[in-house]
């Protein structure tokens, strides 16, 4: 029997909305949207969400669930290198229970804020894996590599993941950054991803110190952070911006999701327009780490922009509604007409594009996966209603056709 999900408003792929309609689901696939008068109890199992807005599930395109536990242990810091120094030290003193509990708490916060897909960064060779699989959340699983873990590309766990990708679990490779990998090692990671046909991601242009490092200027990464590494990374490049450097060594024009991108030159913007790299912005994290916001005027109009919370190591929450509301308040100055519509697109279809999953999720369309959420109406405008929502307003959450929450 087909499922029919009714709601007062349904957000459509063109960011308009339908009324008096229902989304039809066959197993885990969206079959289409039909008017309510066509529904019959004999053919459809009807779920009536009444006075609510139904939309695609949110996609948190960049998060570190495994680092939840670090939030309580961080000391005040004045710069990005000071913060990174602490994170490196803390990560060396982990235990399995800390990681497991962190991931479970992070998953609860994510699901309760309407997230149905995450772009999880995993740096502990799979300690977050079981909890993620058990939760049922759709996952783009970015396996993180740095100089210190470069041998992990030969690990049994990673080789197993390459064989076990499915519709709910999609493996990707994540070289941590240009400053945590030798040029030779970064090229090796790119080649590995090319061989196995996997998408990549990387933290890029996140701090002024990273920019200065790539430009071979004085920076506090070399002064304060590299002493934590076993050896200083070998950066074999002429002075360049991080994006110029990465683009130059990306010889096979692989898809690389660029995370943060809040310190960009005019040349960087030209490269983005030309190459169309997917980008994930994490604006609250940038402010938390004493950095400037991304160029919202550019990214609000860039078609492959996704939104991420980052982790609790660099944010005050991973509640995705908090991230959406923050972006909304800052975007109102840039997009005069209906910024809330574009923000919801970034939080859904934009995230799917950033993770390379837009053929299957991110919008309510025929033949896409049934990843849906609904919120109680708080405003006569369905878009503003979502902007004004909190976790308590989440009425329904569905992942892959299975209801996770219904009130």
Language model segments and positions:
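N-terminal metal-binding scaffold of metallo-dependent hydrolase/deaminase domains
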Residues: 1-41, 52, 357, 382, ...
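C-terminal cap of metal-dependent C-N hydrolases
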Residues: 8, 369-407
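Alpha-helical scaffold segments that flank or form the walls of functional sites
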Residues: 53, 71-137, 158-166
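Histidine-centered catalytic micro-motifs
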Residues: 56-68, 199-208
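Active-site beta-loop-alpha junctions enriched in small/polar residues
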Residues: 64, 123-124, 144-148, 176-178, ...
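Active-site gating loops and adjacent loop-to-helix segments of metal-dependent hydrolytic enzymes
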Residues: 69-100, 140-143, 208-253, 327-337
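Histidine/acidic residue-rich metal-binding segments in metalloenzymes
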Residues: 130-133, 155-278, 290-305, 359
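His/Asp/Glu-enriched, well-ordered alpha-helical/loop segment
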Residues: 248-251, 294-377, 389
């Amino acid at each position: 029997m087909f499922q029919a999900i009714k709601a007062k408003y349904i957000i459509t792929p063109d960011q308009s909305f339908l009324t008096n309609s229902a989304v039809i689901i066959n197993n885990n696939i969206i079959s289409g949207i039909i008017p309510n008068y066509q529904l019959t109890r004999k053919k459809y199992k009807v779920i009536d969400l009444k006075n609510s807005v139904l939309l695609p599930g949110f996609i948190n395109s960049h998060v570190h669930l495994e680092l939840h536990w670090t939030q309580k242990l961080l000391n005040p810091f004045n710069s990005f290198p000071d913060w990174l120094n602490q994170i490196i030290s803390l990560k060396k003193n982990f235990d399995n229970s800390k990681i497991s509990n962190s991931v479970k708490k992070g998953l609860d916060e994510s699901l309760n804020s309407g997230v149905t897909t995450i772009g999880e960064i995993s740096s502990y060779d799979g300690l977050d894996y079981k909890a993620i699989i058990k939760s049922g959340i759709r996952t783009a699983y970015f396996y993180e590599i740095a100089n210190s873990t470069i041998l992990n590309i030969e690990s049994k766990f990673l080789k197993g993941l390459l064989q076990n990708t499915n519709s709910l679990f999609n493996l990707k490779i994540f070289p941590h950054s240009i400053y945590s990998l030798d040029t030779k090692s970064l090229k090796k990671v790119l080649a590995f991803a090319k061989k196995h046909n996997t998408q990549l991601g990387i933290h890029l242009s996140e701090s002024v110190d990273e920019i200065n490092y790539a430009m071979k200027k004085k920076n506090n990464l070399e002064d304060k952070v590299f002493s934590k590494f076993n050896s200083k990374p070998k950066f074999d490049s002429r002075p360049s911006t991080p994006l110029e450097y990465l683009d130059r060594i990306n010889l096979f024009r692989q898809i690389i999701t660029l995370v943060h991108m809040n310190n960009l030159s005019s040349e960087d913007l030209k490269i983005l327009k030309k190459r169309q790299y997917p980008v994930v912005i994490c604006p609250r994290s940038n402010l938390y780490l004493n950095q400037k916001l991304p160029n919202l005027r550019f990214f609000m109009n860039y078609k492959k922009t996704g939104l991420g919370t980052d982790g609790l190591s660099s944010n005050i929450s991973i509640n995705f509604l908090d991230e959406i509301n923050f972006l909304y308040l800052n975007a109102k100055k840039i997009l005069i007409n209906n910024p809330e519509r574009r923000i919801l697109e970034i939080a859904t279809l934009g995230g799917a594009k950033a993770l390379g999953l837009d053929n299957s999720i991110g919008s309510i369309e025929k033949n896409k996966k049934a990843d849906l959420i609904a919120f109680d109406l708080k405003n006569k405008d369905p878009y503003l209603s979502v902007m004004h929502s909190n976790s308590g307003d989440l009425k329904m959450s569905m992942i892959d056709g299975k209801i996770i929450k219904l009130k």
